[in-house]
């Protein structure tokens, strides 16, 4: 059943992407309809030469996840890796598509490996962080979760398909799950414990982001304006992401 659901979601996503294929402009590069892995794919319909090219509709952001506030940047483990998957529409605002708007749906899987204690105290309605003690037997601990959001971007790039690009935008979304995970032992003796008890978890999120790059590749940075935990007496942390964006088509 799980495999069927995953396959259905993948098929629906590909159907939307295929119907939103974009065409080329100009006779000098008739085969270059889009960059990346889907370069020669024009969707269910043949491409029309006279229409402008469009870009960056399926974007993967491979990110290092951190936070800032009561804890400083780069104090967490380097293995705090996450993935944003963005299924976007590129809406041209100019004839050569040098300025456009990007919007769609984004899913984010984030992991922040803090290697400490992050515990919710229900009686006080707060969440606290404490460093690992010598008596603790866990090998690593991390904060992980999933969120869905609607991005909105203003995009600038040169008309050439070998273009330099800048994306400036933001997201509004919902944190659908968040947990703290403790891992003890190795291999066959490995034991994992998850805790979802955060009495003041912020379910809504809003952030700003930027991409700066060339053709299929870009550097990515993101900052969440709202804190992870809402109670002012909790540890105050704003999520930060930085990494590399890859646009397949």
Please annotate each region the language model reported.
Residues 65-67, 106-112, 173-177, 222-228, ...:
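Structural signature of outer-membrane beta-barrel domains
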Residues 71-78, 112-145, 175-187, 192-207:
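Extracellular/periplasm-exposed beta-strand and loop segments of Gram-negative cell-envelope proteins
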Residues 85-91, 105-107, 150-156, 168-174, ...:
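Residues on the lipid-exposed face of transmembrane beta-strands in outer-membrane beta-barrel proteins
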